[in-house]
Amino acid sequence: MKSKILCNLFKGKSCICLYTNCLNENNVNKCYYNLVRNYSDHVKDHFNKPRNVGSFDKNEKNIGTSIVGKASCGDVIKLQLKIENDVIKDARFMAFGCGSAIASSSYATELIKGKTIDEALKIKNNDIASHLSLPPVKIHCSLLAEDAIKHAIKNYREKVLT
């Protein structure tokens, strides 16, 4: 069973454990599944206190909405942008997935607020991954966030043109 548990394992490094039975009263310093991943402080911060969680009314003309996902890992991100005069005034997200997907989504919403549409389209997954110090096996989460930005802008532009 997956769960969010902060623990101090392996030489005192702080990590996010993916399994509830990793820790128990008898053996708090051993992960039975050895599937603990070390995350940066930025990932832990955005995972534990995600910014801009929620949604807007997708029927509003100035709201661009995207839903992107990766079937192989089960991550799904819904991103919505509130755009006025080609400037992203606000952003909201909802995510179902791992800590890296949540952190990537949360950071992406902070990164794009106040940017023009053209500036937001220049954001690459590397901007997100490098800030969060994502490990190589979690880079796909930053790719999802980049795709979500692009698709939300595309949706907004389609709505404005109709």
UniProtKB/Swiss-Prot annotation:
GO cellular component, one term: cytoplasm
Principal localisation: mitochondrion
Any Gene Ontology biological process: iron-sulfur cluster assembly
Pfam families, sorted: NifU_N (PF01592)
Cofactor: [4Fe-4S] cluster
Name by which UniProt lists this protein: Iron-sulfur cluster assembly protein IscU
Biological or metabolic pathway of the protein: Cofactor biosynthesis; iron-sulfur cluster biosynthesis
UniProt similarity note: Belongs to the NifU family.
Keywords: 4Fe-4S, Iron, Iron-sulfur, Metal-binding, Mitochondrion, Transit peptide
Subcellular location: Mitochondrion
Stated role: Participates in iron-sulfur cluster formation (ISC) pathway for iron-sulfur (Fe-S) cluster biogenesis. Plays a role of a major scaffold protein for [Fe-S] assembly; assembles [4Fe-4S] clusters directly upon interaction with the catalytic component IscS-Isd11 as part of the scaffold complex. Can transfer [4Fe-4S] clusters to target apo-proteins.
A GO term for molecular function: 2 iron, 2 sulfur cluster binding
